Amino acid sequence: MTPNGHHFRTVIYNAAAVGNLQRIKVFTINSRNDRQWIIDCFNSDQDGRYPLVIAARNGHANVVEYLLEIGADPSVRGVVEFDNENIQGTPPLWAASAAGHIEIVKLLIEKANADVNQATNTRSTPLRGACYDGHLDIVKYLLEKGADPHIPNRHGHTCLMIASYRNKVGIVEELLKTGIDVNKKTERGNTALHDAAESGNVEVVKILLKHGSVLMKDIQGVDPLMGAALSGFLDVLNVLADQMPSGIHKRDALKLLGSTLLDKKMDAMSAMNCWKQSMEVPLHADDLRLVREMETFFEPQEVYEYQREAQNIAQVELLDGNIEAQRMQALVIRERILGGAHTDVHYYLRFRGAVYCDMGQMNRCYDLWKHALELQQKHFAPLYYGTITTLQSFHETFSMSLNDFVNNHHANRNLRVRSSWVKYVFNGVCLELERAAAWTGAPLLEDTECCGKERCQHATEESEYKKLVYVAVHLVNVLERLSLPSAHIDDSDEEKEPKADVRRLMIVCHELHIPLLHHTLEERIPDSNSAELGLPKAAVLEQLLELDLDVNATDKNNDTPMHILLRAREFRKSLVRALLVRGTWLFARNRHGDVVLNVMKRMKALNHANFDDLPLGRHITLAGLVANAMRVKYPKKFVGVEEQMPLELRRFYLAH
C-alpha cells in the first residue's frame, strides 16, 4: 500500500525550500502518477506550507518546473516571508514576482497558465508585488501578459501608489503608459502624489504632475504639499508649492515643515530658518487679509502657555534662542493648520508630554496629554485606538512616577502625582465607555487603521472594553496609594479626597454587559511596555464590592470572579478573603468542570497557596453540597429538575 501523500509533505517542503531537486525526486518517483497522492502532498493545505510556493519564493526554477510537471497546482495559496512578515494567501506567481525571479514567473504563466491577477489575502496582485521592490523586467512582462494595473489592495492602494512611495521611477513611468488613473484615491483619500511627496521622491512627484496629478486632500484634510511638510522634505515642498493658487499654502507648509524639523528631526536651527522663510512668501491682498483675521481672532490656549502663532518676522525672531517657546510654537502651528482631529497633532502632544515627563515635569506632561485626550474624544468614535493608548499611557506614567517619587524619598516634588489628575483620567475612561454605550453610528472599530502587517488583526469591542476596565481599576489602585502617608498628598480639599466615582464605572459596565469583577481580578500577561501588571489592592476590590456586585456572576466560560483570581500567578489571600466574605459559592463549576473548592485544594497540595487561616468550612453551605451532589453524583436522576425550580434557585443549581 502506497503511503499517504500527507506523510511526505514536510520533507518535500523542506527540500523545495532549499532547492534540493534530487531529494524531491527520491520521494516522488514511485507516486508521481498517483493523482490522489499528488493532491495530498502538493495541493492540500497544511498551515500554508506548499512546496511550489516556497520554491517560487526562493528562486528554485528547476524545482518549480519539476513540481508543475508532476501535477502541482499553480493556483495554491500559501504563506511566505518577506521583510520579516508572513504574507498570507500567497500564490506561487506572487511569490516569484515579489522576489524578482523572472524565469519562474515565465514558467508559471507560459507552462502552467497561472492567473496573472491572482492576489494574496490582502488583495495584492503579482504586479503589485513586483512593483514593491522595483522589478521592472517582471512588471513589463506581467503587463504584456494581461496583468491589470488598476487592481488595488484591500485598502485601495494601487500599483502606481506603491511604486511612487518606493521611488521606483522606471516602474512609475511604465505604469503611466497603461493609462492608469493618476488621481485614484485609497479608502483614506490618499493618491500616488501623496505617497511620492510623503517619501520625498522629487523625480516621481514631477512625473506625476506632468501626467496630470492634482493636489487633493485626504480624509484628514492633508494634501501632498502638507504631506511633504509633515515628512520633512523641503525640495518636494518647493515643487508642489508652485502648483498652489495662493502663497498662503506655501506659507503654512513652511510653518508646518519647521514644526516637523523641530519635533521630528530635533533641528531647531533649521526650524527657525523655515519659519523665517514662511514670512518671506509673497502674499496677495486676500492672503494678507486672511493672516490679519487669524491674528485678530486667534485665541491662545493655556495648554500652550498662552503662546500666539507667529505671523511676522519680528514675532519669529522673538523665538530665537528660546527652545521652550519654539516647542510650544510648533504645537500651536500644527493644531491650527491640521486641526484637532489629525493624528499628528495628538502624537506630538503626547511626544512633547513624554519629554517633559522624562525631565521631571509631570504637570506639563499631564496638561499636554489631557489636551490630546480631549481632542481624541471630541473628534473620534468611541474605542478609537489612539484614545485608548492615551488612557493607558496616563495609567502607566502615573504608576511609574509615583514609584519614583516614593522611592526617591520625595526628593523631586515635580514627580508627585496629584489625585485630581488621576480622577480626571478615571472619568475619561468612564466617558469613553459611556460614549460606546450611547453610540448609534457605524459599527465601532470599523475605521481602525491597519497595523501595517499583511495579516492585520483588528481589535474587538470586548478586548477594548477589557483594556479600559483594566485602566480604570488600576487608576483606583493609584488613588489608594495616594491616600497613604508615603504619598505626601497636598493639603487642598480636592487632593485630600482621593476617591474615584466607582459607581459610575459600575453603571456603564452593567449597561455594556462587561464583567467588571472578572476583569478586575484577571492578572495581565507581563510585557515590556506596562508599568503595573499585578492584581489591585484589597481596598480597591472592597470599593467595588460595596456596590453590591455579584461575586457569583459568570462570564462566557462560566467562570466566577474566584475562578479568575485563583489563576493568577500571584496568590493574594486578602482578595480571596474579600470574595469569601461576600458569599462566593465554593462549589461553583465552570465550563471546564473546575470547581472552586477543588481548585483551592489542588493549589494547596502543590504548595502554590496556603489557605490554613481562611476558614473555608464556614463558607460551605448545605445548599452548595446538595447542588454539587445532584450535579456530580446523581446527574441522571435529576435531569431537567431545574425546570421546576424558581429562577434564583435554578441559577444556583446550574452554577454547580
UniProtKB/Swiss-Prot annotation:
This is Sex-determining protein fem-1. Pfam families: Ank (PF00023), Ank_2 (PF12796). GO terms for cellular component: Cul2-RING ubiquitin ligase complex; cytoplasm; protein serine/threonine phosphatase complex; protein-containing complex; ubiquitin ligase complex. TPR repeats lie at residues 346-379. The record marks D320, G321 as: Cleavage. Changing D133H: Locomotor defects due to neuronal dysfunction. Difficulty performing omega bends but no defects in reversals. Does not affect fertility. Keywords: ANK repeat, Cytoplasm, Developmental protein, Differentiation, Phosphoprotein, Repeat, Sexual differentiation, TPR repeat, Ubl conjugation pathway. The gene is fem-1. PROSITE patterns: ANK_REP_REGION, ANK_REPEAT. PANTHER family: ANKYRIN REPEAT CONTAINING (PTHR24173), PROTEIN FEM-1 HOMOLOG CG6966 (PTHR24173:SF85). Belongs to the fem-1 family. Substrate-recognition component of the cullin-RING-based CBC(fem-1) (Cul2-ElonginB-ElonginC) E3 ubiquitin-protein ligase complex of the DesCEND (destruction via C-end degrons) pathway, which recognizes a C-degron located at the extreme C terminus of target proteins, leading to their ubiquitination and degradation. The C-degron recognized by the DesCEND pathway is usually a motif of less than ten residues and can be present in full-length proteins, truncated proteins or proteolytically cleaved forms. Sex-determining protein; essential for the adoption of the male sexual fate in all tissues. The keyword Repeat applies. ANK repeats lie at residues 47-76, 88-118, 122-151, 155-184, 188-217, 220-250, 557-588. It comes from Caenorhabditis elegans. GO terms for biological process: cell differentiation; male germ-line sex determination; male sex determination; male somatic sex determination; masculinization of hermaphroditic germ-line; proteasome-mediated ubiquitin-dependent protein catabolic process; protein ubiquitination; regulation of gene expression. The keyword Cytoplasm applies. It is found in: Cytoplasm. Pathway: Protein modification; protein ubiquitination. A motif (VHL-box) lies at residues 541-548. Component of a complex containing fem-1, fem-2 and fem-3. Interacts with fem-2 (via N-terminus) and fem-3. Component of the CBC(fem-1) E3 ubiquitin-protein ligase complex, at least composed of cul-2, elc-1, tra-1, fem-1, fem-2 and fem-3; mediates the ubiquitination and subsequent proteasomal degradation of tra-1. Interacts with cul-2. Interacts with tra-1. Interacts (via VHL-box motif) with elc-1. Interacts with sel-10. Interacts with ced-4. One of its GO terms (molecular function) is ubiquitin-like ligase-substrate adaptor activity. Gene3D superfamilies: Ankyrin repeat-containing domain, Tetratricopeptide repeat domain.
